[in-house]
Amino acid sequence: MNLITTIITITITLSAVLATISFWLPQISPDAEKLSPYECGFDPLGSARLPFSLRFFLIAILFLLFDLEIALLLPLPWGDQLHTPTLTLIWSTAVLALLTLGLIYEWTQGGLEWAE
């Protein structure tokens, strides 16, 4: 048998064994918690149209902005190998300053305060 066939056989066998074990283990000592589906802390039998706080959305948008900032600043150490490393540093400082000013503005406007 060649290497790929061996790897595929081991993968399928291991997957089947783990799937079988995961179905048998909860049935050994059944419990209401073990037999109920878990939906990220929400009741799966309740209404799906519950009111959703706008603060969650705001925090998610802020997280995405700062995640994007990190993605933009990650290649910065390789920027000193360009023809003009000073220009790269100026642009990255400008992006960082703009996002910092936006965070300060959001903070002073009370957007980060969690109000009920």
Curated annotation (Swiss-Prot):
Catalytic EC class: translocase
The record lists the membrane-crossing segments as 3-23, 56-76, 87-107
Which EC numbers characterise this protein's activity in its record?
Answer: 7.1.1.2
Q: GO MF terms on file?
A: NADH dehydrogenase (ubiquinone) activity
Membrane topology term reads:
Multi-pass membrane protein
As its record notes, the protein acts as a catalyst of:
a ubiquinone + NADH + 5 H(+)(in) = a ubiquinol + NAD(+) + 4 H(+)(out)
Which species does this protein come from? Oncorhynchus mykiss
Q: Which UniProt keywords are given for this protein, alphabetically ordered?
A: Electron transport, Membrane, Mitochondrion, NAD, Respiratory chain, Translocase, Transmembrane, Transmembrane helix, Transport, Ubiquinone
* Gene transcribed to yield this protein: MT-ND3
Q: What is this protein called?
A: NADH-ubiquinone oxidoreductase chain 3
Family assignment from sequence similarity: Belongs to the complex I subunit 3 family.
Q: What does this protein do?
A: Core subunit of the mitochondrial membrane respiratory chain NADH dehydrogenase (Complex I) that is believed to belong to the minimal assembly required for catalysis. Complex I functions in the transfer of electrons from NADH to the respiratory chain. The immediate electron acceptor for the enzyme is believed to be ubiquinone.
What Gene3D superfamilies does this protein map onto? NADH:ubiquinone/plastoquinone oxidoreductase, chain 3
* Entry GO CC: mitochondrial membrane; NADH dehydrogenase complex
Chief place of localization: mitochondrion
Q: Where in the cell is it found?
A: Mitochondrion membrane
Matching InterPro entries = NADH_UbQ/plastoQ_OxRdtase_su3, NDAH_ubi_oxred_su3_sf
Under the heading PANTHER family, the entry gives: NADH-UBIQUINONE OXIDOREDUCTASE CHAIN 3 (PTHR11058:SF9)
